[in-house]
Amino acid sequence: MKKKQLKPEPYMMNRELSWLKFNERVLNEAGNPRVPLAERLTFASIYQSNLDEFYMVRVGTLMDQMESSEVVRENKTNMTSKEQVKAIIDATRELDIKKAVIYEQLMGELEPQGIRIINFNKLSGKEGELLETYFDNEIAPYLSANIISKQQPFPFLQNKEIYAVALLATKGGKTKTAIIPCSNNVFKRLIDIPTRPGTFMLSEELILHFLPKLFKKYEIKEKSLLRITRNADIDTETIYDEDMDYRDAMENLVKQRKRMNPVRMEFSRKINKKLIAEICKYIHMDKNHVFMSRVPLDLSFVFAIQNYLRMQGAEKEKLFYQKRSPRMTPQLKEKESLIAQIEQKDVLLSYPFENIKSFTNLLYEAARDDSVVSIKMTLYRLAVRSQIVDALVEAAENGKEVVVLVELRARFDEESNIEYSRKLEEAGCRVIYGLSGLKVHSKLCLITRKTEKGLEYITQIGTGNYNEKTSTLYTDLSLITAKQEIGKEAAEVFACLLRGETIEETHVLLVAPKCLQNKVLDMIDDEICHAKNREEAYIGIKINSLTDKVIIEKL
């Protein structure tokens, strides 16, 4: 007997397709004439990097599910993993068309500003000679050209790196495949044309043009640039083993991610279908995941264009947003004790408008304050040179008890967090790594002081990471309070984390997985009740995404 399939709710949308709609709005900003031109370049690059990560994580997850013997269905639209992947690919192809149109618009609008990205066929004879000399001296010595054979198997293609691929023909008519890595830190990606200031050529296009110099014995029948995106959905639950060090196991798992199966392949030109099929066979990828791109395969070069524009003087400032720096909050007097001020009143910091330095200064003050006995904190994503970590290290070196939960499973920040966990441990901090089956995404800090009144708490609860860089970019709130009922409950949260447990009951804090959804539902019910009684009722929610079906239905 077949299992009855549930019909999708008409007001719900598939999570993955909803995300693609969000990323389309990012792309729309790249085409928005009301946005300064140089900033539109940023939006174009963000759109592409967002899509890369989406394929690495979300499509990677769906493809893992497709390999399972059990059919997994999405709980809102009842779509299978296979149906979702097909819908994603179809939507991506439509977005690729839109991306190409917007890219051409951007390039056209850059020309009056003195910026051009050109191909070799747009160069004069003299310019071509100059670039040939540049290629011979600055690029060719660093290239490793591979002709695929029994002696030289198909090379491993790195995630998101650009390669030149060519179909070669011998004098006898036999064909061979060649692969050349085009990404190298030794030579520049954006090559300037000396005779034309503001005119550039991408290094991979120069490599593609001069392939005949690398394969002198062959005729180049077909050539293109290619780029693959690999699955990055590592299964961290496999490393929970009493007999192995969790951090070392996580480090090994992150290394394995670099060799996971590809989920997408992009070409810069239409090429022979047999060659595409051959490459797909080599890398074990479905040909339906192959895309043809009319724009450069990696748009990160736009930041070099922005730097060039900034160097052109004040007249180009109109192409950028007016620079705004976070201010120090007027709620606190920075030259006076922050602890004493917070004891008198709560402080709500609003990023990026206010500076996270007020919080880092509080941590440094706590590290040096004799009344502070402990600092406990959860860390998810940190800045490259983290003042937060430095303050915690100083606190530990000053004899404070410092307990830090470092979430090693913060995707793409695993290696950074592994290094920070070592630094904290070496300073004398107690470092823990979270709970099996659950990521600790909370942003919670608890400062405990021993005073004449007994133990007193200062608690910080935030919506954003403890990251000095992203706090200048993302809108987040950070509450710092001396309310003891909040501090006591935060202390219980940390006690549970240290025991490897989730908190079962809370009164003032909303803590997933057991004390968040039910409290949100209660608050929604309260507003429904107010509305039914013709009283003032309002629900305002600011979140990155909403996928909880129960809450969606309640709303």
Language-model regions, residue ranges each:
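N-terminal localization/anchoring segments of enzymes in phospholipid and broader phosphate metabolism
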Residues: 1-539, 548, 554
